[in-house]
């Protein structure tokens, strides 16, 4: 819950009134994280106690519907609880009294908060996506991105109504625990338990409380013990709130109060009608009940007898003053205003409700209080949701005292699903599957109500497929296909007219290795074919971990940064920050040459090539410095490109000039940038999703 607290404070401090938005607290289940490829052991590594300290990083991003626009990646507070994630907020634990609130064990989860963009009326686009990047290391292989469309993220309503039973059960568990402690319980806890028992009655239903309970009386514990608090029961119990019900209840309560006030005013008016003020009366300003009565008495011209004064000033004398001690003649309207003593009565420190008595007893038992304990002792809404990408569960949490979505202190505008409802109704009316299949008249009507649909409905070539829940996944696959197509074209172009493969990287060979060189030369075509098959068979997520994909990102980020103070660099640290400082810096992936051709490197190997690889002379290469000494090393990382007979190497520089290196340093060059054709909006969308801004300059350290 502390992560939710921190995100809420950050959201409240950085909130921009000109950009309406909301915040949603979620608990992503361990099953959902594991299905997304997150190793749970990495989230608790070095934390044997499973504490709140995190050794991972979480960032969030908002991705607009169809346009490809994204907000920059922003850090968010997060905490992983290995077990009882939902139970930790429904039944918190006092360290000195771990048996206070029994609960049914449940799964762990990640506490985090996601921003939700909306318009001034709170209307959000259900196809907008909230992206969450969880990284447990600096490498691309140590990060996963989870995507949540607003349609699956924002619940229809809260479920505070389902929490009433938990609060009553919490009170009863407290009473029984204090009764078991007996004389060892603090006096304040015993008194609170007695009040709670009296207020709940034998049936557990709140009953009117007596005016006082003897401090020496113990709590009356009756009935059978309550079952432990069950998170699963809470998630599946009926009791969903309705937006109209909450509004109606508040409206009815206000109307009842206003009706009572109106009746009281009418009654007073009938007894003491307001009379016209004489023109000769002195002017005066009255504040408070007694001043108003004095002014009314002075200017009304009515009788000034004791009975009349009794009626006018009954109960309104200043504290400590005798009633009508002076029976003198009439005074000016403002004469006695300064003699009226206005006092501030301090609020009583005595609890006035069962919840406040629970607060008193809890503080006495725990020796203090914490914000998360306080929020757990108030109403909590937990809504079970399902993640589209992993088909696993996550929970949307709302706290009564929260300013995030569903909180009773949430600031306007309130999130509205009006757009999602309108799209569903329009498609149902015309019996079409997707909104862009609607008739022109229906689309125009939607655009008049929701101008934000201009891009998805009217753009001739949207960056992402509109009205598609899987548009982000399809976009990544489309970029991978474009990159592979460009690589294939560049390799074919380089080998047309007879291959020019010679030893571009210098290595010395002995006479006994001539037979081996002939064997490698004979296998060149097979190795190339297997290399392309290995790349084509790479999953989209894994493809963006390769040296080729990272070089593409660096290339696009450098293009987007021309004329600007900042450029885009890949999110991970797989390639050194100074990779983009020189055309001589290359990032290589190594592939096996025996058996199946597989990529052997977890991250690219960065080298510096001294010399012109495009010329006829031989060049030399060396490793780039700056690799962390704590990074795990594979055997292949000990060899330079072409140095070992076991590896086929594919590398690129910042301009996407590639080098295919066979064993022995035999290589040919390719110009992949000439065949990679991405429209500017598409290239920008790729950069925003896979990169972050960084200040330009040589030797940049991110």
From Swiss-Prot:
Organism phylogeny: Viruses, Duplodnaviria, Heunggongvirae, Peploviricota, Herviviricetes
Name of the protein this chain belongs to: Capsid vertex component 1
Top-level lineage group: Viruses
Keyword field: Capsid protein, Host nucleus, Late protein, Viral genome packaging, Viral release from host cell, Virion
Cystine residue pairs: none
UniProt subcellular location: Virion; Host nucleus
Family per similarity comment: Belongs to the herpesviridae CVC1 protein family.
Keyword Kinase applies: no
Biased composition (Low complexity): 210-224
The keyword 4Fe-4S is annotated on this UniProt entry: no
Listed Pfam families: Herpes_UL17 (PF04559)
Region (Disordered) location: 200-244
Record's GO cellular component terms: host cell nucleus; viral capsid
Quaternary context: Interacts (via C-terminus) with capsid vertex component 2/CVC2.
GO terms of biological process kind: chromosome organization
Purpose of the protein: Capsid vertex-specific component that plays a role during viral DNA encapsidation, assuring correct genome cleavage and presumably stabilizing capsids that contain full-length viral genomes.
HAMAP family xref list: HSV_CVC1
């Amino acid at each position: 819950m502390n992560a939710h607290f921190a995100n809420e404070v950050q959201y409240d401090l950085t909130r921009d009134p000109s950009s309406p938005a909301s915040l949603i607290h979620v608990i992503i289940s361990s099953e959902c994280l594991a299905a997304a490829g997150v190793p749970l052991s990495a989230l608790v590594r070095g934390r044997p106690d499973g504490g709140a300290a995190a050794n991972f990083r979480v960032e969030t991003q908002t991705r607009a519907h169809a346009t490809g626009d994204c907000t920059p990646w922003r850090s968010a507070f997060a905490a992983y609880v290995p077990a009882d994630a939902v139970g930790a907020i429904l039944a918190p634990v006092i360290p000195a009294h771990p048996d206070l609130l029994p609960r049914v064990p449940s799964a762990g989860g990640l506490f985090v908060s996601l921003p939700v963009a909306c318009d001034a009326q709170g209307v959000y686009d259900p196809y907008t996506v909230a992206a969450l990047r969880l990284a447990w290391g600096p490498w691309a292989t140590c990060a996963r991105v989870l995507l949540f469309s607003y349609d699956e993220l924002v619940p229809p309503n809260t479920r505070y109504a389902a929490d009433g039973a938990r609060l009553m059960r919490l009170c009863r568990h407290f009473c029984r625990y204090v009764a078991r402690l007996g004389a060892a319980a603090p006096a304040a806890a015993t008194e609170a338990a007695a009040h709670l028992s009296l207020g709940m009655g034998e049936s557990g239903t709140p009953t009117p409380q007596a005016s006082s309970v003897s401090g020496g009386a113990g709590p009356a514990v009756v009935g059978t013990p309550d079952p432990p608090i069950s998170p699963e029961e809470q998630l599946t119990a009926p009791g969903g709130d309705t937006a109209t019900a909450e509004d109606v209840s508040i409206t009815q309560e206000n109307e009842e109060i206003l009706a009572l006030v109106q009746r009281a005013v009418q009654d007073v008016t009938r007894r003491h009608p307001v009379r016209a003020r004489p023109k000769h009366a002195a002017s005066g300003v009255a504040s408070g009940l007694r001043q108003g009565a004095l002014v009314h008495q002075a200017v009304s011209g009515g009788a000034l007898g004791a009975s009349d004064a009794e009626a006018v000033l009954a109960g309104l004398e200043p504290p400590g003053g005798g009633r009508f001690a002076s029976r003198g003649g009439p005074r000016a309207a403002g004469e006695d205003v300064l003699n009226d003593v206005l006092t501030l009565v301090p609020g009583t420190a005595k609890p006035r409700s069962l919840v406040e008595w629970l607060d008193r007893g809890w503080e006495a038992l725990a020796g203090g209080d914490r914000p998360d304990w306080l929020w757990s002792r108030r109403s909590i809404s937990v809504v079970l949701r399902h993640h589209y990408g992993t088909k696993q569960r996550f929970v949307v949490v709302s706290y009564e005292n929260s300013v995030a979505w569903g909180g009773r202190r949430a600031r306007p505008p309130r999130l509205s699903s009006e757009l999602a409802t309108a799209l569903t109704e329009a498609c149902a009316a015309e019996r079409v599957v997707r909104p862009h299949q609607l008739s022109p008249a229906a689309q125009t009507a939607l655009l008049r109500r929701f101008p934000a649909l201009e891009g998805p409905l009217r753009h001739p070539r949207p960056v992402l497929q509109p009205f598609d829940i899987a548009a982000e996944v399809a976009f990544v696959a489309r970029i991978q296909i474009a990159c592979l197509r460009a690589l294939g074209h560049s390799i074919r172009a380089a080998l047309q007219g007879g291959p020019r493969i010679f030893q571009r990287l210098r290595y010395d060979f002995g006479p006994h290795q001539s037979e081996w060189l002939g064997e490698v030369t004979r296998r060149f075509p097979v190795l190339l074919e297997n290399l392309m098959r290995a790349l084509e068979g790479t999953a989209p997520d894994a493809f963006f971990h390769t040296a080729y994909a990272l070089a593409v990102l660096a290339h696009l980020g450098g293009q987007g940064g021309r004329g600007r103070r900042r450029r885009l660099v890949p999110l991970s640290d797989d390639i050194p920050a100074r990779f983009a400082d020189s055309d001589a810096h290359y990032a290589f992936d190594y592939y096996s040459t025996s058996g199946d051709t597989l990529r052997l490197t977890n991250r690219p190997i960065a080298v510096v090539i001294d010399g012109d690889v495009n010329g006829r002379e031989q060049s030399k290469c060396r490793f780039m410095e700056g690799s962390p000494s704590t990074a795990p090393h594979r055997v292949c990382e000990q060899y330079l490109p072409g140095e070992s007979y076991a590896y086929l190497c594919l590398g690129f520089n910042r301009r996407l000039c590639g080098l295919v290196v066979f064993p022995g340093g035999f290589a040919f060059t390719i110009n992949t940038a000439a065949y990679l054709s991405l429209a500017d909006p598409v290239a920008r969308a790729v950069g925003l999703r896979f990169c972050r801004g960084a200040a330009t300059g040589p030797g940049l350290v991110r």
